[in-house]
């Protein structure tokens, strides 16, 4: 009776210093997903890594996972508000990619793999780097007081909005494709949470549509299976992320989208109302309300906002202004 070939795990879990040292001694290029315990590894890039493993092979390309809180060597990466991918070759750091930016990850992997092949085959000098971004101005963790209570928060001072990949797109296995297109459009995904919305959540979320004839059908659809709830920001400047995301989604009705914006997400992945694949906030005010409703455990603040003089009420920023993640979110 023939024995089955043992399947090799895509990403090796590095949980001890010994395993870290073993990783550094590996021949070739190793891509390490350094993640925070409260949010877990970066799932959207797994399909990319699987694809590259098939195309490139595992002889010189390796993938690993490492929780920042478990390894002293990763102390400076603790509390970071976005995924961090460290590239190691010959035991040295050769590249860093921040954010779940699939096109950039793919390019960096191919470039660094080619460079390492030349080091091994031709004796070329390996280009080693230091992660210069680990400076005070880029620290995501801020220890301060909020309403008189001590809190640990992770802050990203860029405008953000809510996006939902709806149950119809998730059920058809289109989540990874949509996430890839979101990233290619220049968005950074700060949070990606998969869960099934409750009926109470959906009714409150879509209360502005309660008078529409198809409201009950919409409620049933949104409760029918898991959705992916995303918090998006833009990787380029402070442009209106809400409006930009609505443009990428396309018209609400997939049939209209296919006529007017055939490259939009709803044109490509929607079928008919209410199965239009994705949701986006209507405006900045709506984004504030939706983010607060679906992510009640997240804290929103603007560290640059100061109380006005003359006894006026203190100015506050909504969720679209600055996003703060409690470090202990499950």
Curated annotation (Swiss-Prot):
<dbReference type="GO" id="GO:0042995">
    <property type="term" value="C:cell projection"/>
</dbReference>
<dbReference type="InterPro" id="IPR036850">
    <property type="entry name" value="NDK-like_dom_sf"/>
</dbReference>
<feature type="domain" description="Thioredoxin">
    <location>
        <begin position="11"/>
        <end position="115"/>
    </location>
</feature>
<comment type="subunit">
    <text>Monomer and homodimer.</text>
</comment>
<dbReference type="GO" id="GO:0006183">
    <property type="term" value="P:GTP biosynthetic process"/>
</dbReference>
<dbReference type="InterPro" id="IPR001564">
    <property type="entry name" value="Nucleoside_diP_kinase"/>
</dbReference>
<dbReference type="GO" id="GO:0004550">
    <property type="term" value="F:nucleoside diphosphate kinase activity"/>
</dbReference>
<keyword id="KW-0966">Cell projection</keyword>
<dbReference type="InterPro" id="IPR034907">
    <property type="entry name" value="NDK-like_dom"/>
</dbReference>
<dbReference type="InterPro" id="IPR017937">
    <property type="entry name" value="Thioredoxin_CS"/>
</dbReference>
<comment type="function">
    <text>May be a regulator of microtubule physiology.</text>
</comment>
<dbReference type="GO" id="GO:0005856">
    <property type="term" value="C:cytoskeleton"/>
</dbReference>
<feature type="compositionally biased region" description="Low complexity">
    <location>
        <begin position="307"/>
        <end position="322"/>
    </location>
</feature>
<feature type="region of interest" description="Disordered">
    <location>
        <begin position="300"/>
        <end position="330"/>
    </location>
</feature>
<dbReference type="InterPro" id="IPR051766">
    <property type="entry name" value="TXND_domain-containing"/>
</dbReference>
<feature type="region of interest" description="NDK">
    <location>
        <begin position="157"/>
        <end position="303"/>
    </location>
</feature>
<comment type="similarity">
    <text>Belongs to the NDK family.</text>
</comment>
<protein>
    <recommendedName>
        <fullName>Thioredoxin domain-containing protein 6</fullName>
    </recommendedName>
</protein>
<dbReference type="GO" id="GO:0120293">
    <property type="term" value="C:dynein axonemal particle"/>
</dbReference>
<dbReference type="GO" id="GO:0006241">
    <property type="term" value="P:CTP biosynthetic process"/>
</dbReference>
<keyword id="KW-0206">Cytoskeleton</keyword>
<dbReference type="InterPro" id="IPR036249">
    <property type="entry name" value="Thioredoxin-like_sf"/>
</dbReference>
<dbReference type="Pfam" id="PF00085">
    <property type="entry name" value="Thioredoxin"/>
</dbReference>
<keyword id="KW-0963">Cytoplasm</keyword>
<dbReference type="GO" id="GO:0006228">
    <property type="term" value="P:UTP biosynthetic process"/>
</dbReference>
<dbReference type="InterPro" id="IPR013766">
    <property type="entry name" value="Thioredoxin_domain"/>
</dbReference>
<dbReference type="Pfam" id="PF00334">
    <property type="entry name" value="NDK"/>
</dbReference>
